[in-house]
Each structure stands twice: as C-alpha cells, then as structure tokens.
C-alpha cells in the first residue's frame, strides 16, 4: 500500500515540513523556540477569539466588558489571564529566538532572517494595539504617547497622527480600529510564518557549529518532535504558573483604573517587552531623534548579516565575540530596567550610556571582534 502522507497533495507538504524533514543531528534546545513561537501564536489566536466574542470596542463599555469577561463568563478569567500572559511568553520566546540567531550566525540565511525581523515588527505592532483594548489608564495614555511619536515626522506628522486616531484625540474611533487591527494582524503573522518556514526549508536549519550538515541529517520526527514536546511542557508550565498564581505580575496597576483623559498617570510606560526600545527613545532629548533611535534599535537587525566579518559562522569558538554578545544581553536587560524607571537622575545618564553601548556593540565592536579573531586564527609563519 502506498503511504498516504507521501502521496496526498496536502499531507505531502506537512510530511516534508514536519515529519520527513532532514534536520541536523546536533541542534540543541536553543532551536526549540521556533516551534514554541508557533504554539504561542495558536494559543493567542484561540484565547483572543474567545475574548473577542464578549469584548465590546466602545470607550463607554470596553473596560467593563473586560471586567464582565473575568467575572461572568465561564472560565473568562482564565482565558483573559492566558491571553495577557501568553503575550509575555510570546516575547520571551521571540527574544531568545533572535538571540540564538545572533549567537549561532543564523542571520546569514538572509531571506529567513529578514522575514523574521518583519515578523518581529508585526508582533510588536499587534501587542501594542492589543494593550490599548482594555481601555485602562495605561492603555489610553500608552496609545496617546506612542501614536503621538508619528507627529515627529516632518511636514506630514500631525496629519498622520490625526488620521491614525480618526479624530483630534485617542477616542472611540481609535479603539474600534485598534480592535480591528488586533484581530487581523495575528493572521498576517501566521501567513508570514509560513513564508519564514518556506525560506528556512530552502536552506535547512543552521546548527551550533555553524558548518554544513548535509552529510549528517536525521528525520524531524520522532527525534525533534519529541524534543519540541518537552519544550512545550516547559512553556505551558511557566504560562499556567503565571496565569494561575500571579496573573497581574507583569501588568501595570494603573490599568485597573478606567481610562481618564483628564488624569495623567505619574509615569507612562509600555509593557515590559517594549521597555528596552522605550528607554532608547527617552534617552535622546530631541523628539525626532528619539523616534529615529527607536526605529533603529529594531531595524538594526536587518543590517546584522552585512556586519558579519568573522570567518566562522557561529560564536561557539569565538570567545571575544561571545563576551560581547553577553555584554549586549546584559545591556538590553539594563535598558529594560531603565525603561520602567521615572525620568530623573541617575536613570537618565544610565539610559543614555546603555543606548550608546547598544549601537556601539552591534555596529562597531562585534564586527571588529570578528576581524581580530580572524587575525588571531591565521597560521603564524
């Protein structure tokens, strides 16, 4: 009998992508995050769908509709907590996935990497519009502050902001369109994920050594499917622990108050996963300069493949580059901490130094380290 999964037009695609896919034999747990991101996306779409059934995108009822979901809908509290904390897990996996790509030189698959950066931007946009929906104080003021950044664009800025708002301030029209975007964008993310996978399967996965592995491949199933299930168990353990024991740990207390345009919170800040970029934005006193630095902090990922100077792909055997990578990691954690602090000394100067170091590491120090390591590895006569 002919094996159906190898002949059926639809099952053949699934078979080539998830069952008989040739995978390097030495990829570590750092390669688990791609599948975990896919699972996070499915969790977010499903919980979001159930929330959308009860949510109302109207300024008068949005806040109370979220309270209604938590109090009156069967397991509404659980669905809402899973959705809110699922976003945090999504970004945690995203940052680890990007970090692994930088450490092991996966960015040299340029098409896969560039689609990945576009995916990151799309997920960030989705999370931003989603944060506005509960219509709490931080939702309203976060939307006001971040959308106002478009006004820094010369000549068309203010017109652009009012066009995005649908009026002269963040109001009912803004909330309605943000809800529409928040519902639509996850499906765009799902589509881009398929493109991301298509490009990845053109080249095959990278591996910790950063060397071609065509001579030593193993089938994805059962080896890596089992490994991915282990990763899934860890993900669900952390997500459920967060959602059931401390669902508000990563949220902002100000968001428990309904949006009030007449009362500004003492310290406006986004969710934790945007704080590093927010700290870079705030570290520049000029508005346009801050917006450009904010954009550059993410878009800099697009030029990383062109800054690769080392003869070796992976950082596994490059101790100087490794040190700089972990300094970059610590620097990003510092920026995240600074983004959550009020705008006063010593936080201002720490934020400015960390922002300078962030760009310096990626644009100058890491390429120089690659060149120096090439020189050190050159056989001496």
UniProtKB/Swiss-Prot annotation:
Residues binding a ubiquinone: 201
One Gene Ontology CC term in the entry: mitochondrial inner membrane
UniProt-listed SUPFAM superfamilies: a domain/subunit of cytochrome bc1 complex (Ubiquinol-cytochrome c reductase) (SSF81648), Transmembrane di-heme cytochromes (SSF81342)
Protein location: Mitochondrion inner membrane
Superkingdom in the source lineage: Eukaryota
Keywords recorded for this protein, A-Z: Electron transport, Heme, Iron, Membrane, Metal-binding, Mitochondrion, Mitochondrion inner membrane, Respiratory chain, Transmembrane, Transmembrane helix, Transport, Ubiquinone
Principal location class: mitochondrion
Cofactor(s) required for function per UniProt: heme b
Binding site for heme b b562: 83, 182
GO biological process, one term: mitochondrial electron transport, ubiquinol to cytochrome c
Gene3D superfamilies according to UniProt: Cytochrome Bc1 Complex, Chain C
Cofactor binding: number and manner: Binds 2 heme b groups non-covalently.
Binding site for heme b b566: 97, 196
Annotated family: Belongs to the cytochrome b family.
Quaternary structure and partners: The cytochrome bc1 complex contains 11 subunits: 3 respiratory subunits (MT-CYB, CYC1 and UQCRFS1), 2 core proteins (UQCRC1 and UQCRC2) and 6 low-molecular weight proteins (UQCRH/QCR6, UQCRB/QCR7, UQCRQ/QCR8, UQCR10/QCR9, UQCR11/QCR10 and a cleavage product of UQCRFS1). This cytochrome bc1 complex then forms a dimer.
Role: Component of the ubiquinol-cytochrome c reductase complex (complex III or cytochrome b-c1 complex) that is part of the mitochondrial respiratory chain. The b-c1 complex mediates electron transfer from ubiquinol to cytochrome c. Contributes to the generation of a proton gradient across the mitochondrial membrane that is then used for ATP synthesis.
Protein known as: Cytochrome b
């Amino acid at each position: 009998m002919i094996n159906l999964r190898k002949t059926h037009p639809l099952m053949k695609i699934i078979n080539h992508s998830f069952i008989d896919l040739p995978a390097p034999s030495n990829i570590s747990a750092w390669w688990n995050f791609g599948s975990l991101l896919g699972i996070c996306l499915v969790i977010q779409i499903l919980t979001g769908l159930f929330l959308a059934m009860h949510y109302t995108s109207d300024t008068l009822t949005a806040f109370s509709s979220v309270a209604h979901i938590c109090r009156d809908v069967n397991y509404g509290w659980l669905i809402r907590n899973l959705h809110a904390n699922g976003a945090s897990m999504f970004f945690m996996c995203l940052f680890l996935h990007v970090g692994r790509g930088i450490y092991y030189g996966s960015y040299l698959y340029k098409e896969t990497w560039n689609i990945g950066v576009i995916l990151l931007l799309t997920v960030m946009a989705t999370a931003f519009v989603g944060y506005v929906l509960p219509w709490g104080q931080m939702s309203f003021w976060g939307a006001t502050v971040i959308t106002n950044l478009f006004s820094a664009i010369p000549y068309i800025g203010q017109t652009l902001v009012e066009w995005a708002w649908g009026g002269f301030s963040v109001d009912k029209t803004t909330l309605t369109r943000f809800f529409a975007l928040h519902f639509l964008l996850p499906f765009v993310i799902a589509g881009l994920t398929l493109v991301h996978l298509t490009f990845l399967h053109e080249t095959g996965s990278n591996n910790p050594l950063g060397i071609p592995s065509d001579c030593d491949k193993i089938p994805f199933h059962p080896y890596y499917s089992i490994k991915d299930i282990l990763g899934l168990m860890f993900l669900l353990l952390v997500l459920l622990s967060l959602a059931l024991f401390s669902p508000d740990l990563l949220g902002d207390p100000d968001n428990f108050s309904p949006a009030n345009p007449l009362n500004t919170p003492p310290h406006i800040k986004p969710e934790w996963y945007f704080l590093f970029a927010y700290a870079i934005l705030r570290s520049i006193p000029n508005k346009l300069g801050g917006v450009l630095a904010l954009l550059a902090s993410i878009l800099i990922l697009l030029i990383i493949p062109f800054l690769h100077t080392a003869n070796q792909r992976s950082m596994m055997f490059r101790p100087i580059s490794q040190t700089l990578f972990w300094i970059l990691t610590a620097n990003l954690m510092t920026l995240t901490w600074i983004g959550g602090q009020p705008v006063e000394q010593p936080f201002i100067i720490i934020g400015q130094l960390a922002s300078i170091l962030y760009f310096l590491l990626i644009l100058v120090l890491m390429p120089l380290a690659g060149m120096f390591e090439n020189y050190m590895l050159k056989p001496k006569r």
